[in-house]
């Protein structure tokens, strides 16, 4: 069992070195405080040392909802709100002493899902015994890894929910809403798209729900988005969106209509979810 794990870990380490990933930038005051720009299509490198804790800090408006790793038995993950604490731990081997964390063999991938975004990491257990300054730089661990997010586009007017820089007539506003029992608290007051992005606008002070795109087979996938004033700007246009917050659920349907022939938002009195 242990030998198989060591062989698999060795192969994983080889595969890790063969792929590109985003390396965080060390801080000017302390290299262990690292920053990386967020991009939904990039894998980020996280370097840890045995006996130390690393924390990954996501956007303050995010909440971690799921964490998965390829070698979960060798790592401890503790999510708290928008912060994920990571620490290497011994591998429990049957019939033999537990294997202590070993640099290289503990390398794995880490996937994090929040209520706003998806994140992908290469998680590396680096060695503190670097023979050269270059090797030390490559093994530089992170006490804190934080993301820098792209600025949300400025709305043309705070009084208007329309954010896209396209003529109003080019917007598709034909959206219908199906509200679950007791779910009015997460219902948007407007929905529209410009063919590339979808806007869901909410009342001031209203909490934002998690947003999922629904596939034809019913599978739900968390979407990437950013916040623009009182709107969630979803980085895609989908036939069906599902909004969720606790037990509250709302279904948003894109009716693909001509904006000039439809009201701003159709709130249908459909059967509850």
UniProtKB/Swiss-Prot annotation:
Signal sequence range: 1-20
Matching InterPro entries: Conjugal_tfr_TrbG/VirB9/CagX, VirB9, VirB9/CagX/TrbG_C, VirB9/CagX/TrbG_C_sf
Subcellular location: Cell outer membrane
Keyword Transport applies: yes
Functional summary from the UniProt entry: Component of the type IV secretion system ptl required for secretion of assembled pertussis toxin (PTX) through the outer membrane.
Subunit composition and interactions: Forms a complex with PtlI.
Gene Ontology terms: cellular component: cell outer membrane
Organism: Bordetella pertussis (strain Tohama I / ATCC BAA-589 / NCTC 13251)
Family: Belongs to the TrbG/VirB9 family.
Main localization, broad class: membrane
Induction pattern: Cotranscribed with ptxABCDE. Activated by the two-component regulatory system BvgS/BvgA.
UniProt keyword annotations, A-Z: Cell outer membrane, Membrane, Signal, Transport
Protein name as annotated: Type IV secretion system protein PtlF
Residue stretches in coiled coil: none
């Amino acid at each position: 069992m242990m030998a198989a794990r060591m062989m698999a870990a060795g192969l994983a380490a080889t595969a890790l070195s063969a792929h590109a990933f985003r390396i965080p930038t060390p801080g000017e005051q302390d290299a262990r405080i690292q920053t990386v720009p967020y991009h939904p299509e990039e894998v980020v490198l996280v370097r840890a040392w045995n006996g130390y804790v690393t924390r990954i800090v996501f956007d303050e408006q995010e909440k971690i909802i799921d964490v998965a790793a390829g070698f979960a038995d060798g790592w401890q993950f503790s999510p708290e709100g928008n912060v994920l604490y990571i620490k290497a731990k011994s591998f429990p081997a049957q019939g033999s002493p537990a294997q202590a964390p070993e640099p290289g063999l503990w390398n794995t991938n880490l996937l994090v899902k929040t209520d706003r975004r998806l994140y992908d990491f290469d998680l590396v257990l680096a060695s503190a015994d670097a023979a050269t300054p270059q090797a030390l730089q490559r093994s530089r661990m992170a006490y804190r890894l934080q993301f820098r997010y792209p600025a949300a586009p400025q709305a043309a007017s705070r009084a208007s929910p329309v954010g896209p820089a396209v003529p109003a007539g080019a917007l598709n506003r034909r959206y219908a809403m199906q509200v679950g029992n007791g779910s009015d608290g997460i219902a948007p007051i407007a929905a529209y798209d410009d063919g590339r992005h979808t806007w869901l606008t909410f009342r001031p002070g209203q909490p934002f729900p998690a947003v999922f795109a629904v596939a034809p087979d019913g599978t739900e996938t968390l979407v990437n988005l950013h916040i623009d004033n009182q709107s969630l700007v979803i980085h895609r246009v989908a036939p069906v969106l599902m909004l969720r917050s606790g037990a509250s659920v709302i279904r948003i349907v894109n009716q693909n209509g001509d904006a000039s022939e439809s009201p701003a938002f159709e709130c249908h009195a459909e059967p509850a979810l």
